[in-house]
Amino acid sequence: MLLNAADKALWRLALPMIFSNITVPLLGLVDTAVIGHLDSPVYLGGVAVGATAISFLFMLLLFLRMSTTGLTAQAWGAKDPLRLARALVQPLVLALGAGVLIILFRLPLINLALHIVGGSEAVLEQARRFLEIRWLSAPASLANLVLLGWLLGVQYARAPVILLVVGNLLNIVLDLWLVMGLRMNVQGAALATVTAEYATLIIGLMMAKRVLTLRGVSLAMLKNAWRGDMRRLLALNRDIMLRSLLLQLCFGALTVFGARLGSDIVAVNAVLMTMLTFTAYALDGFAYAVEAHSGQAYGARDGSQLLEVWRAACRQSGMVALAFALVYSLAGGHIIALLTSLPSLQQLADRYLIWQTILPVVGVWCYLLDGMFIGATRGAEMRNSMAVAAAGFAVTLLTVPVLGNHGLWLALAVFLALRGLSLALIWRRHWRRGTWFS
């Protein structure tokens, strides 16, 4: 038998998440295509600057999704309806509160973001118009992260697909109507996203209500779920946010150091990063599945189930990582030709293609172990692991003056390897001492 029960359970959750992840860049492509057809490049520049500011802020707040998944999966495994309700309501209160604060302080936040980015006045003006509307979606966007994490934690496999696909399709339709039809330009693109986010929130709440009813969570439980000690949730979110900040800084450094190597290197790295991002979407699907299943095992204090999850994840995601490495080694040149038609960039990209073969095999373990640690809500250890990896990344950047762009890709490989290795050592120590469930 090719797949055992644990393998199938993993794929049931991983496959919808992989499919959902693929819809995310599709939305970006449509945004670019729609805005790119307007009569001035400043519109596209404004949306690009605005999207960068939003992406940075919301990536820092991604802890809302991750912590919610871990806490929910543990409550699900423990079969505790009150904890299940609290795992939804407390993060929702936090998300809505943070979203309202972003709306209230959006003007100074916009001023700060545009001051940091800089650029032409015309582009910054369009970015300002975009952000003034786009950040009105903050409560819905952050609440959607919580709902996505909670529905993933209860292993409702179809929910992420429905939420992301419906939200993105609605966004695309509204983009076309508001930008191209009503000629609202960047304000139309922002309004389309805001509307789609609130529509997604309504759908997500309906799904959550259905699960809560099936699990016997009463209205009285929900009303009281926001009470109770939030210190664990706040500490967990703090640690994951610091981890996310280090991750953002390291990937930002790749862009900064690449820019110093010349415009051709920036362009080539953008092409190669597209390939790496696609790989990450697939491997992230397994990480999400591991979060839910390992969290369930943690909540049930079931060591044998946890080992089953881990072995299945290693088998299945390991094979997927090897498949990506094989495809990139055999057909990488053809893929690059699809991504850029410039012969000079194609030739330059071929020099660094070897890293696309190496990185999936090196990086898969840190994705899986992230999932294990999120499921166990061990945020402090994830933060410390990321700090070790970031230090290794920084030291390896010293090779850039000698190795050039190979030094940048080596730094990324070291970063991924150290994340996986440090988490593996922590996991091994806990398992040997019998302290993983403590």
What kind of feature is each model-predicted range?
Residues 28-32, 333-334, 377:
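Non-cytoplasmic
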Residues 29, 38-41, 75-78, 153-154, ...:
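Helix-loop interface residues and adjacent transmembrane-helix termini in multi-pass membrane transporters
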Residues 29-33, 146-150, 169-177, 205, ...:
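Alpha-helical transmembrane segments of multipass membrane proteins
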Residues 18-70, 134-141, 231-296, 317-324, ...:
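Transmembrane helix-bundle signature of multi-pass secondary active exporters and lipid flippases
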Residues 1-14, 72-139, 173, 181-238, ...:
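Short alpha-helical transmembrane segments in multi-pass integral membrane proteins
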Residues 62-65, 133-152, 160-168, 189-204, ...:
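Short runs within selected transmembrane alpha-helices of multi-pass transporters and secretion channels
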Residues 44-104, 141-160, 268-330, 366-377, ...:
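Small-residue-rich hydrophobic transmembrane alpha-helices
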